Each structure stands twice: as structure tokens, then as C-alpha cells.
Swiss-Prot record:
SS bond partners: 167-325
Membrane topology per record: Single-pass type II membrane protein
GO biological process: lipid metabolic process; protein glycosylation
The protein's enzyme class: transferase
Protein name from the UniProt record: Lactosylceramide alpha-2,3-sialyltransferase
Gene assigned in the entry: St3gal5
Species assigned in the record: Rattus norvegicus
Family annotation (InterPro entries): Glyco_trans_29 (IPR001675), Glycosyltransferase_29 (IPR051142), GT29-like_sf (IPR038578), Sialyl_trans (IPR012163)
Alphabetically ordered keywords of this record: Disulfide bond, Glycoprotein, Glycosyltransferase, Golgi apparatus, Lipid metabolism, Membrane, Signal-anchor, Transferase, Transmembrane, Transmembrane helix
């Protein structure tokens, strides 16, 4: 006959068995539930991509008024040339861009920030705080592997040695067409071009000198003709496959087909430059530009959509220029959204209205930022597109 102890033990064992059975049953029930959630997420993503593709195919915006691209007000041409002449008529002011940025954005702009990622034993705390493009959290080993392939990590010595450097950041705006600023733009010490903006066929208006080509994989020119032997290719890294793409470009290797599937458009198969001409943009520049200067919200984990907290390549390039050069000028910047049928770029027929469809950038905030830089004399707007 069982005593109290054995009875309690039997009850305990039975309870434990029941609990184990219940827990195992719950786990089994939860697994299909989690699997179902994952399947639903994948289906939503596929449906979303399909929907965006259909909308893109069926979006019939008004055709651009190409007459506006072909006709340029003579007064605007004169004004652009006068703006450029004024830059070179004055004596270059050493440290002007950094000093004025520091005064304008006190505590938000680091005067001693390295423009490019350096090969050092440990990355800075700021570099590792965020995921790309604002930092290299979880990617430090990949960055170090890339840096091991690059023989140089600084601005070229002949440019660093120059007492006072003048930069021009050339945007891709349709406003450049017809201004015939090419010769004047070639006079700057440092010429920064963005993404795939072509020179061939447009040099009369945009010049043919390039010091820096700043872009991300999908934005890099596909044609070898757009690269010159002494260009610096400054890579902006946004996602994991961007590191693999850059590694392939530096090593002059082909990128596997399956990796290409992760890019939203065709990427260059080769970059005809030597490894010493590649640089990696310091992500802290993007972080400071976005969160400190433009006051965008920090990245949040989201299943769908964007926070509009990523600055355009053009804005990032302007901030980079203030770290590289003593004086900074702009050409080809400015979005006139009140003229949706005006050509957006100097090299294609895409309309200004397309900017209303993009979901990554805050055009209004960026325009206000540029207006502030011009008003305070940090930069000079040569083409007059920023109102």
C-alpha cells in the first residue's frame, strides 16, 4: 500500500509527464505556426515586389518637355559663368569649408573625420554602432579583408600636399545642359562625379576631368569609357552583397550569377582601375550627415518600407567635399518639383516628376540644407539650381 511519500511522488511524476507532453505538444503546434508566418512574410514580399513592378510598367507619366532641355535662357548661361569666374578671381581660403561647417553645425560636424576607411587594428566605436550605410556593425571582418586588398587608403599625396584646394561636386541635374560650363569645371583641383553620370558626349557642359567617382554598385557606370586611369573610385556600401561586389571589382574577378540576383538593377561586371584607385567611404560621414546634420531619425527595424533617412549620394558627396577641400562649389544640383515635366538629368529623358515616386530620400529637407549652406557661404552654387 503506497504511503504519503510514494503517493506524492506518483502525483509529481504524473504531473511532470503531463507537463512534458503539454510542452512538446505546444512546441509542435508552434513550429507550423512559425513556419506559416515565414511563408506569409515571403508571400507578402513577393507580392509587394510584383505590385511595384506592375505599377512601374503601367505608370504613364507625362512625357518630358525636351524643348526645355534644348532651350537655355542666355541670361542663365551668363549667370553660371559669372558665378564660376567669381570663385577663381578670389584667393583660395585654407580651411574655409571645415570652419564654416563647424560653426554652422556645432557639435554635429567632426572636423577631424577621416574621409575614407583606414586600415587600423580596430574600427572606431562610431563605425561599429550602426549597420550599413551608417556603419559597419557585423561587417568589420569584411571591411578589413577589403582594406587588405587596397594598397592605399588616403587622398592621393599630390592633392594632400596642395596648400589650398578647390572642389566642385557635379550633380546630375538637367539644369547643367546647355550651360557650357565644361572648361570652367575642369579648372577645379578636385572634381567629384556621382554614380553613372556620363562624360562622353556631354563634356561641353560637364567637363571631362574626374578626380573622384562616388557611387554604390547599382550606380557605377557600366561603360569602361567613363573611367579614367587616375580616377578614385569611392564606394558607398549599403548591404551585404555590396562588399562581395567591391571585392570582385578590386580583384578583377567575375561576380557569381546568384549574387547578381540581389541587386535591384544591373551592376558593372568590371571596373577598369588598379586596386590603388579604390577607396571605401567612411560610413560615419553618412551617419553624421543623416542623424546629426539633417536630423533624420535613426534606423528602425521595419518589415516593409523605408524611413526616408538615407541622404542622396549628392548630399553625402558635398559633406565629403568639405572634409577633402578648402573651398567647395556645386553644379547641377536642385529639384524643381513645381515643373514635373522638366528633364531630371542632363543625360536622359526621365522627368522631374519621378522624384515624387522615390521612397528613399527626403528632397525637401535636403533642399533646405543646401539653401542653408549657400546662404552661409559654405558652398557656391554655380548653376543656380537651388532656390
Amino acid at each position: 500500500m503506497p504511503n504519503e511519500f510514494t503517493s506524492a511522488k506518483l502525483r509529481s511524476d504524473c504531473s511532470r509527464t503531463s507537463l512534458q507532453w503539454y510542452t512538446q505538444t505546444q512546441h509542435k503546434m508552434r513550429r507550423p505556426s512559425l513556419l506559416l508566418k515565414d511563408i506569409l512574410k515571403c508571400m507578402l514580399v513577393v507580392f509587394g515586389v510584383w505590385l511595384l513592378y506592375i505599377l512601374k510598367l503601367n505608370y504613364t507619366a507625362e512625357e518630358c518637355d525636351m524643348k526645355k532641355l534644348n532651350y537655355v535662357d542666355p541670361a542663365r548661361i551668363k549667370r553660371a559663368h559669372r558665378n564660376t569666374q567669381e570663385v577663381f578671381q578670389k584667393e583660395c581660403r585654407p580651411g574655409h569649408a571645415k570652419k564654416t561647417m563647424d560653426l554652422l553645425f556645432k557639435g554635429k560636424y567632426s572636423m577631424d573625420l577621416e574621409p575614407f576607411v583606414q586600415k587600423i587594428p580596430t574600427a572606431s566605436e562610431a563605425e561599429l554602432k550602426y549597420d550599413p550605410p551608417f556603419g559597419f556593425r557585423k561587417f568589420s571582418s569584411k571591411v578589413q579583408s577589403l582594406l587588405d586588398m587596397l594598397p592605399e587608403h588616403d587622398f592621393p599625396e599630390h592633392l594632400r600636399a596642395k596648400h589650398c584646394k578647390r572642389c566642385v561636386v557635379i550633380g546630375n541635374g538637367g539644369i547643367l545642359h546647355g550651360l557650357e560650363l565644361g572648361h570652367a569645371l575642369n579648372q577645379f583641383d578636385v572634381v567629384i562625379r556621382l554614380n553613372s553620370a556620363p562624360i562622353e558626349g556631354y563634356s561641353e557642359h560637364v567637363g571631362n576631368k574626374t578626380t573622384i567617382r562616388m557611387t554604390y554598385p547599382e550606380g557605377a557606370p557600366l561603360s569602361d569609357a567613363e573611367y579614367y586611369a587616375n580616377d578614385l573610385f569611392v564606394a558607398v556600401l549599403f548591404k551585404s552583397v555590396d562588399f562581395k561586389w567591391l571585392q570582385a571589382m578590386v580583384k578583377n574577378e567575375s561576380l557569381p550569377f546568384w549574387i547578381r540576383l540581389f541587386f535591384w538593377k544591373q551592376v558593372a561586371e568590371k571596373i577598369p582601375l588598379q586596386p590603388k584607385h579604390f577607396r571605401i567611404l567612411n560610413p560615419v560621414i553618412i551617419k553624421e550627415t543623416a542623424f546629426d546634420i539633417l536630423q533624420y531619425s535613426e534606423p528602425q527595424s521595419r518589415f516593409w518600407g523605408h524611413d526616408k533617412n538615407i541622404p542622396t549620394i549628392g548630399i553625402i558627396a558635398i559633406v565629403l567635399a568639405t572634409h577633402l577641400c578648402d573651398e567647395v562649389s556645386l553644379a547641377g544640383f536642385g529639384y524643381d518639383l513645381s515643373q514635373p515635366r522638366t528633364p531630371l538629368h542632363y543625360f536622359d529623358s526621365q522627368c522631374m516628376g519621378a522624384m515624387n515616386w522615390q521612397v528613399m530620400h527626403n528632397v525637401t529637407t535636403e533642399t533646405q540644407f543646401l539653401q542653408k549652406l549657400i546662404k552661409e557661404g559654405v558652398v557656391q552654387d554655380l548653376s543656380g539650381g537651388i532656390h
